[in-house]
Every structure is written in C-alpha cells, then in structure tokens.
C-alpha cells in the first residue's frame, strides 16, 4: 500500500494518489490506484485504475485492467474540461524460451483529442468514438541465434483519427556471441531487419476542418550492433526502400537515413 500528494504545476496544484496491491495466491496478483487531481479553474480529474493477473500454469498468463472515472487531458488549456474514462483491456499470453504468443482486446472510451502544436498541417484531430481494438503477436526462436517476431493491431469497427488501421511490425534478429572465438562471452553481435506497415486512414484535420488522408505505407529498418566487453557500437538505418510516403504530411522520412554511435565504459 502507498499514498502520495504533490504540487505538480500551476495548472495542477494537487496530485494525490493511493495505491494497493495484493498477491493472495501464487500466480495471482491484483493492484489498484485511485487518483485525484485538482486543476486551475476549479477542474478535477478523478479516476481509479484496477489491474489483475493470473498465471494458472507456467508460461500462460491472463491479465486485465480497467480505468474508470474522468480526467482533464490538458490542464494547461483553461477551456479544456474533464472527459469520461471507460477503458478496458484484457490479454492472454503464452511465453516460453522458443515460442511466445499473445492476443489482446481493448476498448477505449470516446474522447476529443488535441492536435499537436509541432505539426502545423494537422492543427486538430476529430472526436474519436468508443473503439474496440484487437492485437495479436508472436515470437518464434527455432534456434538460439535467430528470432522471428511481430505484432498486428486493428480497430474492430471504424477507423479513429490519428492512428493508422492494420498497423503491424515484423522483425528478424540474428544474434551470436561467437563462443568458439570468444569463450568468455565478452563478444555479442546483433543483426536486425524489421518492417512496419499500416493501411489507409485519417491522420487529423486541416485548418478548414477537412480530414487529412493518411496513405498506407511500408518501411524497412536495419540495425547492426557489436559489443566487446564494455565497448559497443551500433549503426541504425531506416526507410531502406526509399519510399516517399510518410506518417505526418510535411514531415518527410529521409531515404536511407542513418544514425550511429559508440559507447565505451571503463574504470580507472
């Protein structure tokens, strides 16, 4: 159990929270949090979060959570008011060393989001209705040095603005320590190739209030990472297919963009 109270900002003068958790049986846990926030202008955010997890057998887990109440999304905007929260989520997962499977369901309550100030071409996002989401994922490691993994998420009905439908990501990772050459295990090589894709949707609204179309796209990304004891380096490249498509209009993703870095830790 725990409790806290803070003065956050001039717009949130009180942030009080109380938490409690319990593990009555092996493989069963529950947790809860109650939040009260007082905002400038006499506004309040009051909600509770409840979560529980059950592991009936080794590797199999069932988890669920709910968030109920009301919250002010942007306290610094004096005209913003509290919106109802009715969010639910449930996940069934199976994880072992060579295989992992996951299926999830979520329902998010209706809300009116704010646009992002840094995206001038998308000044606003339309109201979002109550939405149900289905997410599935898998991980397969046929041998110790190779891993195939991916996930897929899509709303069951309708397409909310700001989030792409049929969103997925898949990746293959090769990893080896070259134990014959480095029996101490100080060497680690990681090669990763991933693909992210989404379908057609609506990213937001323009200055006139008309929907801004989001075209479906596919992007490829690679990562090379080498570690030798406390010395490591990486080379990350994205948009390997040099596509002109993007996620936010006006923010072009460079073709064959790269970033690299070196890290060396040592003690004197």
Predicted regions and their residues:
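Transmembrane beta-strands of outer-membrane beta-barrel pores
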Residues: 3-11, 22, 34-40, 66-74, ...
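C-terminal beta-barrel architecture of Gram-negative outer-membrane proteins
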Residues: 153-166, 170-221
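Extracellular loop and loop/strand-boundary signature of outer-membrane beta-barrel proteins
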Residues: 4-7, 35-40, 73-90, 116-126, ...
């Amino acid at each position: 159990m725990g409790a806290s109270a803070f003065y956050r900002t001039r717009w949130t003068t009180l942030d009080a929270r109380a938490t409690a958790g319990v593990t009555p049986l092996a493989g069963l846990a529950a947790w809860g949090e109650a939040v009260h926030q007082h905002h400038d202008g006499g506004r309040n955010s009051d909600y509770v979060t409840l979560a529980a997890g059950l592991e009936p057998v080794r590797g199999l887990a069932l988890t669920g959570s709910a968030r109920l109440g009301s919250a002010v999304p942007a306290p610094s905007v004096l005209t913003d008011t509290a919106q109802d929260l009715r969010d639910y989520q449930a996940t069934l997962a199976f994880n072992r060393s060579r295989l992992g499977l996951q299926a999830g369901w979520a329902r998010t309550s209706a809300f009116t989001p704010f646009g992002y100030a840094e995206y001038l071409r998308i000044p606003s996002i339309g109201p979002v209705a109550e939405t149900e989401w289905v997410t599935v994922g898998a991980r397969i490691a046929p041998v110790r040095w190779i891993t195939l993994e991916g996930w897929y998420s899509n709303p069951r009905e309708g397409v909310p603005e700001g989030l792409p439908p049929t969103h997925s990501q898949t990746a293959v990772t090769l990893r080896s320590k070259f134990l014959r050459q480095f029996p101490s295990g100080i060497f680690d090589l990681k090669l990763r190739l991933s693909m992210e894709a989404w379908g057609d949707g609506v990213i937001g609204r323009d200055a006139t209030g008309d929907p801004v179309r989001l075209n479906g796209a596919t992007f490829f990304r690679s990562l090379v990472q080498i570690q030798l004891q406390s010395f490591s380096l990486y080379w990350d490249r994205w948009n390997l297919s040099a596509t002109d498509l993007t996620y936010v209009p006006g923010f072009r993703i460079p073709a064959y963009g790269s970033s690299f870095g070196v890290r060396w830790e040592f003690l004197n």
